[in-house]
Swiss-Prot record:
GO biological process: symbiont genome ejection through host cell envelope, long flexible tail mechanism
Quaternary assembly: Homotrimer.
Species of provenance: Lactococcus phage SK1 (Lactococcus lactis bacteriophage SK1)
Subcellular location: Virion
The protein's name: Baseplate protein gp16
Signal sequence, start to end: none
Length: 375
């Protein structure tokens, strides 16, 4: 049977205040409170990252919507928070209570996703780097719940985000899911004592580090003994169309008098000017689904960029998902990169989540969306 700590809400209005006096006289953010209750946890389904599913558990003390629940596990997980700097974290899963029924069964939202809920990200931020976006998200001055920083593997999140949006802002949830899917990583949350021995505070950190700084692919196989289930997941929702008829307004006539240009999405996802295609048609969709688009020229007289049209007719990215029981002889951790053999086929991806119940310990493997054979 598991145990849990229950806290009042970690409201940034209170905790994001720098009036806590350190032994050296420096002022820091207020630390987290002591738990208001300690209880046992039964009838539970607890997801470690919660990127896809909501958790639930029955607690042996009364809880309210808005409370924070820290589930404690008799287990440690390894991380490498900097190159050559390894440590072990006690496995805890931190949630926001979003609903409670009459039997005191609580619906639990993973802390990270609850923290950024309702936050929007300006396009100016989405056009920068993955690090800049994450830094924007993990900021208690603007989001729903308190955090005190994060363990961050810069090698995993290196690079520039490629998030094409029409609106001036995008929901933080959508932006985060897109980045995490691209880099094959999901954040977790941990409550622990401050890193400095002279700092008496307990703090909450978001973990963006894996068990190895330089992740190496682990090859394994799963079979029927691990109760495997298979389905698919749409990791990027795009368009139901695969062919575009594009009219661009003539500046002289102020109307769409010029002949249209046609663009097509090939089976491999590339979008091309159809007039330049010289193939035999076998690499094009079996059924053409056309969409007519109308554009003005920009302030410099230029027509829309190909990237703009690509958003309108690129297919959704759909990948395979495998859910299976943990193998105690080769335990896998969330965010491990894995090549899995299942029923004679090799799937390449990562462990995106882990669910613990009273009866089993299961993993969610999600195939990489960058494979050439992905739908």
């Amino acid at each position: 049977m598991l145990e849990a700590n229950v806290y009042d809400n970690f409201n940034p209005n209170y905790y994001n205040v720098s009036d806590f006096s350190m032994p050296n006289g420096k002022k820091e953010k207020r630390g987290l409170p002591i738990p208001k209750a300690r209880c046992q946890v039964i009838n539970y389904e607890l997801w470690e990252t919660g990127y896809l599913y909501t958790s639930s558990a029955t607690l042996t003390v009364s809880v309210e919507v808005g409370d924070i629940v820290q589930i404690l596990f008799p287990e440690v997980v390894p991380i490498e928070e900097a190159l050559g700097k390894k440590k072990k974290l006690n496995l805890d899963m931190v949630y926001l209570v979003t609903d409670v029924d009459e039997s005191n069964k609580a619906t639990l939202k993973n802390y990270f996703w609850a923290m950024i809920e309702s936050l929007d990200v300006p396009n100016a931020i989405t056009k920068t780097t993955n690090f800049a976006i994450i830094d924007y998200l993990i900021d208690p001055s603007k989001n729903n719940l308190m955090s005190y920083g994060y363990f961050f593997n810069s090698s995993i999140f290196a690079g520039k985000a490629t998030i094409n949006r029409k609106a001036e802002t995008s929901s933080a949830h959508d932006v985060a899911k897109r980045i995490f899917s691209k880099v094959q990583f999901q954040p977790t949350t941990t409550i622990q004592h401050a890193p400095s021995e002279t700092d008496p505070r307990n703090l909450l950190f978001i973990n963006f580090a894996s068990r190895n700084w330089n992740r190496k692919r682990i090859t394994t196989r799963v079979d029927i003994k691990q109760s495997v289930t298979m389905d698919t997941e749409t990791i990027v929702e795009r368009s139901a169309y695969n062919f575009a008829v594009v009219f661009v307004k003539n500046k002289a006539t102020d109307d769409y008098t010029d002949p249209p240009k046609m663009y097509i999405a090939k089976n491999n996802g590339d979008v091309i000017d159809y007039s330049t295609y010289h193939g035999d048609g076998t690499d094009l969709p079996d059924v053409r689904t056309a969409k007519t688009l109308f554009y003005d020229r920009d302030d410099h007289g230029n027509p829309p960029a190909l990237s703009t049209i690509k958003v309108e007719i690129s297919p959704s990215t759909i990948v395979t998902r495998l859910i299976f029981n943990q193998n105690e002889l080769l335990p896998l951790y969330v965010n491990d990169l894995v090549d899995i053999w299942y029923e004679g086929k090799l799937y390449s991806g990562y462990i995106a989540d882990r669910v613990k119940t009273e009866f089993n310990d299961r993993l969610i493997f999600v195939e990489s969306g960058d494979k050439p054979n992905v739908i």
